[in-house]
């Protein structure tokens, strides 16, 4: 630190010539007596057209100015009156009541100020709450649906003998032949155990049946006849004829 600054700090009441120079910088007597201890330095805050750049003023450092706080306002006011071109220095002193209130707010007050001063934060918190409610509702609906499905599945298993629906194939309805149809079919079977394709077509047209119905009836009748006959094995020729008739008959379904 500068020895002059140390002297100013140690002695809060500087000698009169120095403060006289500060009060009237253009005074010749003060400059003659006060500037002997302080070298002249160019004072350049902001160079203006109406302020000479070559003017020399004493270098009053921040330490010297801070040494006597009770005399700062007066010196500053005198300097501002003599040089109005310079900007006014802001007042850095805060009211004690306001500072105390800020310190005494605590976490709760700060949170309230933040909530009141930032509506976006409050809106975001509310939006998060609504999202959580929506997610909870969706989860509850999903659980209800899953429980309902389990209940329906258990009921179906109890009613269907433990088998799920659609697993067992639906049996085809059996053809209900009339007495007249059965009589004609039995008469034809007595003459011919196997039918040609043309004869099968004629019988189907005469009895108002499909060729497949006639073919299936003759197959069932031959099986019954073989069982009644004593379980004799079917000859290869009869088997070939039956297979040929089955392959030649078109499907009527």
Swiss-Prot record:
Question: Which one Pfam family would you cite for this protein?
Answer: Homeodomain
A single GO molecular function, which one?
RNA polymerase II cis-regulatory region sequence-specific DNA binding
Let me know which tissues express this protein, per UniProt: Heart, lateral plate derivatives, kidney, loose connective tissue at sites of bone formation and skeletal muscle-connective tissue apposition.
Q: What is its main location?
A: nucleus
UniProt keywords (A-Z) are:
Activator, Cytoplasm, Developmental protein, DNA-binding, Homeobox, Nucleus, Repressor, Transcription, Transcription regulation
- Compartments it resides in: Nucleus; Cytoplasm
Q: Which GO terms describe its biological process?
A: hematopoietic stem cell differentiation; positive regulation of transcription by RNA polymerase II; sclerotome development; somite development; somite specification
Question: Which InterPro entries does this UniProt record tie to the protein?
Answer: HD, HD_metazoa, Homeobox_CS, Homeodomain-like_sf, MOX-1/MOX-2
What SMART domains does this protein's entry cite? HOX
Q: Where is this region: Disordered?
A: 1-44, 139-177, 226-253
**Where is this chain compositionally biased, Basic and acidic residues type?**
166-177
Q: Does Hydrolase appear among the keywords?
A: no
Mutant lacking the gene: phenotype:
Mice display mild defects in sclerotome derived vertebral and rib bones. Abnormalities are restricted to the sclerotome and its derivatives and are characterized by a remodeling of the cranio-cervical joints, leading to the assimilation of the atlas into the basioccipital bone so that the skull rests on the axis. Mice lacking Meox1 and Meox2 show extremely disrupted somite morphogenesis, patterning and differentiation. They lack an axial skeleton and skeletal muscles are severely deficient.
Q: Which residues bind DNA?
A: 170-229
Record's Gene Ontology CC terms? cytoplasm; nucleus
Function field = Mesodermal transcription factor that plays a key role in somitogenesis and is specifically required for sclerotome development. Required for maintenance of the sclerotome polarity and formation of the cranio-cervical joints. Binds specifically to the promoter of target genes and regulates their expression. Activates expression of NKX3-2 in the sclerotome. Activates expression of CDKN1A and CDKN2A in endothelial cells, acting as a regulator of vascular cell proliferation. While it activates CDKN1A in a DNA-dependent manner, it activates CDKN2A in a DNA-independent manner.
Protein name per its UniProtKB record: Homeobox protein MOX-1
Tell me the gene name.
Meox1
């Amino acid at each position: 630190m500068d020895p002059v600054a140390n002297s100013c700090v140690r002695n809060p009441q500087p000698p009169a010539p120095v403060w006289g120079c500060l009060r009237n910088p253009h005074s010749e007597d003060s400059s003659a007596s006060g500037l002997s201890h302080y070298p002249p330095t160019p004072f350049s805050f902001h160079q203006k057209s109406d302020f000479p750049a070559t003017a020399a003023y004493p270098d009053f450092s921040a330490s010297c100015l801070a040494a006597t706080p009770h005399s700062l306002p007066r010196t500053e006011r005198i300097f501002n009156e003599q040089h109005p071109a310079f900007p006014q220095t802001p007042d850095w002193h805060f009211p004690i009541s306001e500072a105390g209130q800020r310190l005494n707010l605590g976490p709760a007050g700060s949170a309230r100020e933040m909530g009141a001063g930032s509506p976006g934060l409050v809106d975001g918190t509310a939006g998060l709450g609504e999202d959580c409610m929506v997610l909870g509702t969706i989860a509850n609906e999903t659980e209800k649906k899953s429980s309902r499905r389990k209940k329906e599945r258990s009921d179906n298993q109890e009613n269907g003998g433990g088998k799920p629906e659609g697993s067992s194939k639906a049996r085809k309805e059996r053809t209900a032949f009339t007495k007249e149809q059965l009589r004609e079919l039995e008469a034809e079977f007595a003459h011919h155990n196997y039918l040609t394709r043309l004869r099968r077509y004629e019988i189907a047209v005469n009895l108002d049946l499909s060729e497949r119905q006639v073919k299936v009836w003759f197959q069932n009748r031959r099986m019954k006849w073989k069982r009644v006959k004593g379980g004799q094995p079917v000859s290869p020729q009869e088997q070939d004829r039956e297979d040929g008739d089955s392959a030649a008959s078109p499907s009527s379904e």
